[in-house]
Amino acid sequence: MNIVFLGPPGAGKGTYAKELKEILGIPHISTGDMFREEISAKSELGRKVEDILKRGELVPDDLTNVIVKERLSKPDCKKGFILDGYPRTVAQAKALDEILKKLGRELKFAIYFEVSEDVVVKRISNRRICKNCGKIYNLITLPPKINGKCDVCGGELYQREDDREEVVRRRYKVYMDNTYPVIEYYRKSNKLFTVDGSMDVDSVIKEVLNIIRR
């Protein structure tokens, strides 16, 4: 059961993947986690990735593809995986097809969490984080008991720079410009399934399970 999760920042991909990996018994793999693992392992690939990220640049496709191939070759992926944050481009989608072909597998589902720009802005721009313990709040869906203070440690809550409305709108536009063609790529191959990402978490999980278990 090989699955790709697609959707703009704030669509909830990571949240859904964490729930579904427990239900389905397959790993949740994100590009961010893969990069961090390589860096922690101090591998040659990890050193290259670390240098690129320190310069504030995007990790190029060829390097990302190698890391993805290595991760998907591990034993825990034999029964399947949920891939989150990759592919971001049509070139990466084609590379993933080749990687899976060499492993004797194929992608079964590309699940697109459709969320409007306004919903994404509302979700992300209302996010607040504790400066002390890192607990995450949302002023609308998960507000602190005392405004501006962490429920756990009493630390001050702050808004990340890239969570500001104007930045979120820019990130949404970048996603739609660069990654939306991937959605069309999977639509043409009849692997795309669209889920309303503005629903509550339980409803989204139920819908994804309905798609997978049809």
Curated annotation (Swiss-Prot):
Binding-site residues, AMP: 31, 36, 57-59, 85-88, 92, 160, 171
This protein's source sits in the domain of life called: Bacteria
A molecular function GO annotation: zinc ion binding
User: PROSITE patterns given for it?
Assistant: ADENYLATE_KINASE
Q: According to the UniProt record, where is the region LID?
A: 126-163
Primary enzyme class: transferase
Alphabetical list of CDD domains matching this protein: ADK
Pathway this chain belongs to: Purine metabolism; AMP biosynthesis via salvage pathway; AMP from ADP: step 1/1
Q: Which UniProt keywords apply?
A: ATP-binding, Cytoplasm, Kinase, Metal-binding, Nucleotide biosynthesis, Nucleotide-binding, Transferase, Zinc
| Residue ranges the record marks as coiled coil | none
Chain positions recorded as Zn(2+) binding sites: 130, 133, 150, 153
Ligand binding (ATP)? 10-15, 127, 136-137, 199
Residue span of region NMP: 30-59
Q: Any one Gene Ontology biological process term?
A: AMP salvage
**What is the disulfide pattern of this chain?**
none
Query: What Pfam families does the record tag this protein with?
Result: ADK, ADK_lid
Q: Which family does it belong to?
A: Belongs to the adenylate kinase family.
Instruction: Briefly state the protein's biological role.
Output: Catalyzes the reversible transfer of the terminal phosphate group between ATP and AMP. Plays an important role in cellular energy homeostasis and in adenine nucleotide metabolism.
Subunit and interaction comment: Monomer.
Name the chain's protein.
Adenylate kinase
Task: Give the organism, scientific name.
Answer: Thermosipho melanesiensis (strain DSM 12029 / CIP 104789 / BI429)
| Chain's gene name | adk
